[in-house]
Amino acid sequence: MINRQLSRLLLCSILGSTTLISGCALVRKDSAPHQQLKPEQIKLADDIHLASSGWPQAQWWKQLNDPQLDALIQRTLSGSHTLAEAKLREEKAQSQADLLDAGSQLQVAALGMLNRQRVSANGFLSPYAMDAPALGMDGPYYTEATVGLFAGLDLDLWGVHRSAVAAAIGAHNAALAETAAVELSLTTGVAQLYYSMQASYQMLDLLEQTRDVIDYAVKAHQSKVAHGLEAQVPFHGARAQILAVDKQIAAVKGQITETRESLRALIGAGASDMPEIKPVALPRVQTGIPATLSYELLARRPDLQAMRWYVQASLDQVDSARALFYPSFDIKAFFGLDAIHLDTLFKKTSRQFNFIPGLKLPLFDGGRLNANLEGTRAASNMMIERYNQSVLNAVRDVAVNGTRLQTLNDEREMQAEHVEATRFTQRAAEAAYQRGLTSRLQATEARLPVLAEEMSLLMLDSRRVIQSIQLMKSLGGGYQAAPVVEKK
């Protein structure tokens, strides 16, 4: 008898195993994931010779030793609505990961139900429609009551939920990196606007000096005309020059106002609480390019880190889609009390226990699972291609910004020599005036070429500062990949 039972059990096991193996839906088509760019492909061209330096440091702006800029950036990071939105996206991604993780855990709920019913005399329970107390039936009306605990657990043997949770955690890590990217964009944006305003202040000072020189020339020519010493042509020429300078002054003042308003919006200041920005000298440009990029660029660019995590999340989603082809197992259980009469509900004899193991085999689904897998794989490959292009774009940013800064540095050296040459001419004119060889007007007007060349030098210095900040941004701005958020 025992041998017969063992034989039956063995036969059932063999049939069950065969069913599990053959009962799964078939994966008709699944391509391999696309390849990601290799680190050795992340390098600059050999003809980019900007001075080598280390990677930018965290809070890079503090190295500029400008308290005004420090205060502006601190206010931006504490009051930016854009940054607040990014942090809310972090919270949303975290809550989504928690939600998916909770769905894979043991679920327990208290259950209470009251069902007042009239049993049909012609239905399956027709005997209970009789009013026969001797037989234990007092129909047709009954009040069924049920109280107890209901529990359910998805065993997730193939990792459907586990991979979905991993994908959600990857999306959360991507959101963390995106927040860092927003911070980098805000800090560099504030610094660029701030130094653009400082350059405008210095340009305004040079234009006002130019106007003073031309104003002196206007008065000198006017005096000569009044005394009949020269024609009116030089006088009107000087007047035209001063009007042109006035036009430039008005334009620069407009630029200062526009830059201030752009800065106000970026730092989140209101109409009456915008801090006063006092003129300061432009900082020295010291940004260079690291000796090598490779893995470091991937780890130091927050946007690339975000893309990398999105790629990983997409691969986890593919794993989840593949796991749907396999059988799923779950267990449900109930323990409580059930009675068709309220007065007997809490008696010992009303106890009820249900243990319900479940198995679901995907046999025929009309191609739904394959379509889902194919679409998920395509989305993952799209993300990989987007990541690859982002890496190439990041290398391009470093190369282009480094080349531009290198060119500006070369132009600045030549322009500085040009300024020095015009200053020599001015000093010669002043010396000639001191010896009585030229007029004071000629000595004063010799200052104009110097001011013009100093303006050109200022424009180059301004562009160099802005470009160095842009290069620093393309190198990650001191960002380093944060510790990975993992499932606890």
From Swiss-Prot:
One Pfam family hit: OEP
Main localization of the protein described in the UniProt heading: membrane
Keyword Ribosomal protein applies: no
Lipidation (S-diacylglycerol cysteine): 24
Record lipid sites (N-palmitoyl cysteine): 24
SUPFAM superfamilies per the UniProt record, alphabetical: Outer membrane efflux proteins (OEP)
GO MF assignments: efflux transmembrane transporter activity
Family affiliation: Belongs to the outer membrane factor (OMF) (TC 1.B.17) family.
Purpose of the protein: Could be involved in resistance to puromycin, acriflavine and tetraphenylarsonium chloride.
Subunit: Could be part of a tripartite efflux system composed of MdtN, MdtO and MdtP.
Protein's UniProt name: Multidrug resistance outer membrane protein MdtP
The species this protein was found in: Shigella flexneri
